[in-house]
From Swiss-Prot:
Annotated consequence of substituting residue 440 to A: Disrupted salt-bridge between the beta-barrel and the linker, but no effect since acts as the wild-type intimin construct consisting of residues 1-530
Region span, Intimin receptor Tir-binding: 747-934
Secretion signal span: 1-39
Annotated region (Inverse autotransporter), positions in chain: 210-411
Protein name, UniProt field: Intimin
Organism this protein belongs to: Escherichia coli O157:H7
Known partners and oligomeric status: Homodimer. Interacts with Tir.
Domain text: Has a signal sequence, a periplasmic Lys M domain, an inverse autotransporter domain (residues 210-411) predicted to form an outer membrane-embedded 12-stranded beta-barrel, followed by a linker domain (residues 412-449) also embedded in the outer membrane, and an extracellular passenger domain (residues 450-934) with a tightly-folded proteinase K (PK)-resistant, non-Big domain (residues 450-550), 3 Big domains and a C-type lectin domain.
Keywords: Cell adhesion, Cell outer membrane, Disulfide bond, Membrane, Repeat, Signal, Virulence
Length: 934
């Protein structure tokens, strides 16, 4: 049968040439595997144009015979010596009763057993020749042998030669198709010519005699959605069918071929079968293995198929920036029909595929391990036409609705048998579907994987001293070029540090501004980065670890990074101990088995040991005790350290007296503005209990306690007394406290810094002019901001790098037109802002172009006069004084034409490096730049 179908799906581009080549290859295979059957020659001939052969499981040879005028079934029975009961057994499905068959009129068809008919010659016709006619056929039929090739008509012509000749004809057809470059109109004309050619119709008819041919031709969208399939038996007996199946299809702009083989075993009431297929996607270079099983009965079909990839990851044929490969999976299919109403059928399909990004529905909707169930109904009012509707529902509520109409033309049946409803029933029986195509998914379902088009790597962590600037080494691999890197440095910013762009033209040139070292803190910060390319793709997140060292530490040195006590005070009874812990690291990594020496810097006390080795965590401990009240400072040092690291002072106190056991400040720095205060708190204890209403005397060597250098405060119920210290000038202060005749204790030194400021005047890099920022800009022009106050170390930050970037020295680069805020943070955590206001205009140097092209590039926004550019030169100096233009010796720019210049074909120019204003320059002069005004 030949089946034509039409569907509602939209398809794309068709490669007709590949389809026809694949068809020729399939036919060549068919002739090869069937050469023994053809050589036998018993069943392959025709008896006139209206009598055709049909292979059958019960009667291997049947003849469809059209009654002539004056003929009856009884006449045939008598003249051909065929029993009437035999004829009736072959025609039960054509006539309602034997009596109706006997009344068959001229023009109606009767099926006769062909083995009863004598013949003298049988052979395979040549492509394009008229049908061969068997001698001694049915009365009234001509038995004339038509003209053939001389070799074929010779008396010694063998069946093998006939086979070889036919195979050569098929191969020749394929070769012709291969040698042509088929375009749209030519392909259509060629297809129509082949369809109308006698050789083609003979070829289709022969194939129909020995299997099933199904053609689905989509005429719209360049034939996308079209397919051809052939099931070709190469061994056929009543109980077993061995077959090959070839197919080709062009769906979703992919050309796919299928080649398979299988066996079907027929039992009295059912059929069991298996098959193996190789599926090849020639467009995308994907290969898949399919293994399937079948179980059929009358009015029922079921099959199960497994699909296994045979090709790996490679660049996708039609999905940009993705790799693809076949997805492994399976499906289970059921088809059923009502015996009482065989025109109505139903189907059920479940399919499951495996992979992270599988395109079960389409390549734009990728899913993980998707599955789908399909239910459908179809209606076949006559054998020629089948209409259906399928609904598929899958993972993630994806769904698909398909309407279809198929036209099935069977060459082995008369026209009347294809348009009358009573013949539908035969299609649903086991015998009638013996040569049906294997039910499977011939399209390769694909799995996709995003290509590594953009990757970011930071090979080294950063270790540096406080307030230092450290360059960040980045490794970026990008298919489309790096656009920007986005950082999350919130942890670093919380302590006064930051990640910032260096101000160069490279999008990956970043540096870390390290915060102050925090005594007793972790001083380890985690920041993350993500890269973006020019197409909007993003990389993976990458983490950078930054370790801040104190000023006394050296990078790559095995040294003490932390030295702390477990408590701030102890009883001066020579028994109560304070335990110190020293942490030893190298570049942020803990170091084991490192000797650490300990020493008493000030005060009177006794160490438990003078040295200790670090454990697996890089920690070494020592104890301290004393019998003398007072403060004690202890230090720790490794052999590689040039200076020791001091711990905070601890207090030993006489518990029998009211004694200060703790003194601390709430911060170590403050602004020297007379308002920013540092609060001190002392705690007074006696016999382990807080002392209430105890007078405490505070004194300072710098700053004031409410206008005084010495003052008193009284403790509360919790034994605590507080006081605040301010200063109107920068300097360092040490506060001490005493109670009655107790020992004096001192707090850690604090610092007052001048208020952080940014000067409103800027330094223009190109002309060394200091003044207000010009309100007309040169793109990539640079100026320097000057900060003062704070601790003297500053980190800079731009809130919008597309407008301006700023480097570690405060040098600003103007990238685009707009307003932006630049912030500076000092090491003592003061922050100040500088607002850059949008200019009245900015000029942008593009590329060299003729005047007309320059107008197009700038969208007609060229400088209106030479003055526009001379003002830029006066404000910013020569353009090549800036890093972006440093390699250029000349930037001659077009000026927008006046009306008179337009008539003359000339324009004016101005050079942004040498000035040199010129009038009357020909508009086709090369080496002149398009400089746009924004």
């Amino acid at each position: 049968m030949i089946t034509h179908g039409c569907y509602t799906r939209t398809r794309h581009k068709h490669k007709l040439k590949k389809t026809l080549i694949m068809l020729s290859a399939g036919l060549g295979l068919f002739f090869y595997v069937n050469q023994n059957s053809f050589a036998n020659g018993e069943n392959y001939f025709k008896l006139g144009s209206d009598s055709k052969l049909l292979t059958h499981d019960s009667y291997q040879n049947r003849l469809f015979y059209t009654l002539k005028t004056g003929e009856t079934v009884a006449d045939l029975s008598k003249s051909q010596d065929i029993n009437l009961s035999t004829i009736w057994s072959l025609n039960k499905h054509l006539y309602s009763s034997e009596s109706e068959m006997m009344k068959a009129a001229p023009g109606q068809q009767i099926i006769l057993p062909l083995k009863k008919l004598p013949f003298e010659y049988s052979a395979l016709p040549l492509l394009g020749s008229a049908p061969l006619v068997a001698a001694g056929g049915v009365a009234g039929h001509t038995n004339k042998l038509t003209k053939m090739s001389p070799d074929v008509t010779k008396s010694n012509m063998t069946d093998d030669k006939a086979l070889n000749y036919a195979a050569q004809q098929a191969a020749s057809l394929g070769s012709q198709l291969q040698s042509r470059s088929l375009n749209g109109d030519y392909a259509k004309d060629t297809a129509l010519g082949i369809a109308g050619n006698q050789a083609s119709s003979q070829l289709q008819a022969w194939l129909q005699h020995y299997g099933t041919a199904e053609v689905n031709l989509q005429s719209g969208n360049n034939f996308d959605g079209s397919s051809l399939d052939f099931l070709l038996p190469f061994y056929d007996s009543e109980k077993m069918l061995a077959f090959g199946q070839v197919g080709a299809r062009y769906i979703d702009s992919r050309f796919t071929a299928n080649l398979g083989a299988g066996q079907r075993f027929f039992l009295p009431a059912n059929m069991l079968g298996y098959n193996v297929f190789i599926d090849q996607d020639f467009s995308g270079d994907n290969t898949r293995l399919g293994i399937g099983g079948e179980y059929w009965r009358d009015y029922f079909k079921s099959s199960v198929n497994g699909y296994f990839r045979m090709s790996g990851w490679h660049e996708s044929y039609n999905k940009k920036d993705y790799d693809e490969r076949p997805a492994n999976g399976f499906d289970i299919r059921f088809n059923g029909y009502l015996p009482s109403y065989p025109a109505l059928g139903a189907k059920l399909i479940y399919e499951q595929y495996y992979g992270d990004n599988v395109a079960l529905f389409n390549s734009d909707k990728l899913q993980s391990n998707p599955g789908a169930a399909t239910v459908g109904v179809n209606y076949t009012p006559i054998p020629l036409v089948t209409m259906g509707i399928d609904y598929r529902h899958g993972t993630g509520n994806e769904n698909d609705l398909l309407y279809s109409m198929q036209f099935r033309y069977q060459f082995d049946k008369s026209w009347s048998q294809q348009i009358e409803p009573q013949y539908v029933n035969e299609l649903r029986t086991l015998s009638g579907s013996r040569y049906d195509l294997v039910q499977r998914n011939n399209n390769i379902i694909l799995e996709y994987k995003k290509q590594d088009i953009l990757s970011l790597n930071i090979p080294h962590d950063i270790n540096g001293t406080e307030h230092s600037t450290q360059k960040i080494q980045l490794i970026v691999k990008s298919k489309y070029g790096l656009d920007r890197i986005v950082w999350d440095d919130s942890a670093l910013r919380s302590q006064g540090g930051q990640i910032q762009h260096s101000g160069s033209q490279s999008a990956q040139d970043y540096q870390a501004i390290l915060p102050a070292y925090v005594q007793g803190g972790s001083n380890i910060y985690k920041v993350t980065a993500r890269a973006y390319d020019r197409n909007g793709n993003s990389s993976n997140n990458v983490q950078l670890t930054i370790t801040v060292l104190s000023n006394g530490q050296v990078v790559d040195q095995v040294g003490v990074t932390d030295f702390t006590a477990d408590k701030t005070s102890a009883k001066a009874d020579n028994a109560d101990t304070i335990t110190y812990t020293a942490t030893v690291k190298k570049n942020g990594v803990a170091q084991a088995n490192v000797p650490v020496s300990f020493n008493i810097v000030s005060g009177t006390a006794t160490l438990g040991a003078n040295s200790a080795k670090t454990d697996a965590n890089g920690k070494a401990t020592v104890t301290l005790k004393s019998s003398t009240p007072g403060q004690v400072v202890v230090s720790a040092k490794t052999a590689e350290m040039t200076s020791a690291l001091n711990a905070s002072a601890v207090i030993f106190f006489d518990q029998t007296k009211a004694s200060i056991t703790e003194i601390k400040a709430d911060k170590t720095t403050a602004v020297a503005n007379g308002k920013d205060a540092i609060k001190y708190t002392v705690k007074v204890m006696k016999n382990g209990q807080p002392v209430n209403n105890q007078s405490v005397t505070f004194s300072t060597n710098f700053g004031m306690f409410n206008g005084k250098s010495q003052t008193q405060a009284t403790t509360g119920n919790d034994g605590r007394a507080t006081i605040t210290l301010t200063s109107s000038s920068a300097g360092k202060a040490t506060v001490s406290a005493t109670v009655s005749d107790g020992a004096e204790v001192k707090a850690t030194e604090v610092t007052f810094f001048d208020e952080l400021k940014i000067d409103n005047k800027v330094d223009i890099i190109g002309n060394n002019v200091r003044g207000e920022l010009p309100n007309i800009w040169l793109q990539y022009g640079q100026f320097k901001l000057k900060a003062s106050g704070g601790d003297g170390t500053y980190s800079w930050y731009s809130e919008n790098t597309s407008i301006a970037t700023v480097d570690a020295s405060g040098k600003v680069t103007l990238n685009g037109k707009g307003s932006v805020v630049i912030k500076a943070t000092s090491g003592d955590k003061q922050t100040v802002s500088y607002t850059i206001k949008a200019p009245s205009y900015m000029i942008k140097v593009d590329k060299q172009a003729y005047y007309a092209d320059a107008m197009s590039i700038c969208k007609n926004l060229l400088p209106s006069t030479q003055t526009v550019l001379s003002d830029i030169y006066d404000s910013w100096g020569a353009a090549n004084k800036y890093s972006h233009y440093s390699s250029m010796n000349s930037i001659t720019a077009w000026i927008k034409q006046t009306s008179s210049e337009q008539r003359s074909g000339v324009s004016s120019t101005y050079n942004l490096i040498t000035q040199n204003p010129l009038p009357g320059v020909n508009v086709n002069t090369p080496n002149v730049y398009a400089v746009c005004v924004e």
